[in-house]
Design a protein with these regions (language model features):
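Short C-terminal tail/terminal secondary-structure segment
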Residues: 7-14, 260-276
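Canonical Rossmann dinucleotide-binding motif of NAD(H)/NADP(H)-dependent dehydrogenases/reductases
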Residues: 17-48
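The beta1-alpha1 cofactor-binding region of Rossmann-like NAD(H)/NADP(H)-dependent oxidoreductases
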Residues: 75-86, 122, 242
Length: 276
């Protein structure tokens, strides 16, 4: 077999069912979270879905059941620490100890008045920070507590945003949201360093503008769509949630077993392209 063919064959074999036998918790049940849960299930994982929206949980659970048995969805308010711990405990009893966590749950703070710093209110800032920071914190804490059980192992992937690294002052001047997502970047670095000796990895994905329900306002704005075409040239517009799911699959799989404390920016070129 020619060398190139051997490399292709090895790659194809290595990624088939790359989550076989693993239990992966996903926070959120729409958009990126839903795409990821479906992809992980297709790759052989048993999925624990945790989300506030009961209807979305039920819909996603039904979709996952069509891909095979062994999945479970639990409606839970992830801003509530004890409720999150209880949900993870239930998931462990049903599916086993989690091998991975993909923490997606969060949202825009615009409804709380998020915008430029000089217009921000203390209440709006706190609400936006809680909406994005608490679900990631509570889920990561609950997951890592279970992953520390002997033999310790696991992979935790948080979702941040390109806005934490490459701002868009004209169209997305949402400073509380950027600060909250910046916190995810810092948490990943600190936690990765602390838990590496235990074999538990922490990484972060920073997506660009993705076509999700959270981005519905942006998707309906011709100015934003034109901006996205220029700012994300690899995508030619908004990113597909499946692109983020693919990156998460890599970080949760053993293919990335030597990677921790890293920020994987999946932005279609946003952070290296001028479009303002």
């Amino acid at each position: 077999m020619p060398g190139a063919d051997r490399r292709v064959a090895w790659y194809q074999m290595s990624v088939v069912h790359s989550l076989d036998g693993k239990v992966v918790a996903v926070t959120g049940a729409s958009g990126i979270a839903a795409a990821a849960a479906r992809r992980f299930a297709a790759e052989g994982a048993r999925i624990l879905v945790l989300s506030l929206d009961e209807a979305e949980c039920a819909t996603l659970a039904s979709d996952l059941d069509s891909l095979g048995a062994g999945h479970h969805a639990i409606p839970v308010d992830l801003t509530d620490g004890p409720a999150t711990e209880a949900a993870f405990a239930s998931g462990r009893a049903l599916l086993g100890r989690p091998d991975g966590l993909f923490a997606v749950a969060g949202g825009s703070g615009r409804r709380f008045g998020d915008g430029p710093l000089h217009d921000a209110t203390t209440e709006g800032w706190r609400a936006t920070m809680d909406l994005n920071g608490l679900p990631a914190f509570h889920a990561a804490r609950a997951a890592v507590r279970l992953m520390l059980e002997e033999p310790a192992r696991g992979s935790i992937v948080l979702v941040a945003s390109v806005l934490a690294q490459a701002p868009s002052p004209r169209l997305f001047p949402t400073h509380a949201y950027a600060a909250a997502k910046g916190g995810a970047l810092s948490l990943v670095k600190a936690a990765a360093s602390f838990y590496a000796p235990s074999g538990i990895r922490f990484n972060c994905i920073a997506p660009g503008l993705v076509d999700t329900p959270m981005a519905a306002r942006a998707a309906a704005d011709p100015d934003v769509i034109d901006f996205a075409r220029r700012k994300q040239p690899l995508a030619g517009g908004m990113l597909d949630p499946a692109e983020i799911a693919a990156a998460a699959l890599f970080l949760l799989s053993d293919e990335s077993r030597m990677i921790t404390g890293q920020i994987l920016t999946v932005d279609g070129g946003w952070s290296v392209t001028e479009a303002e």
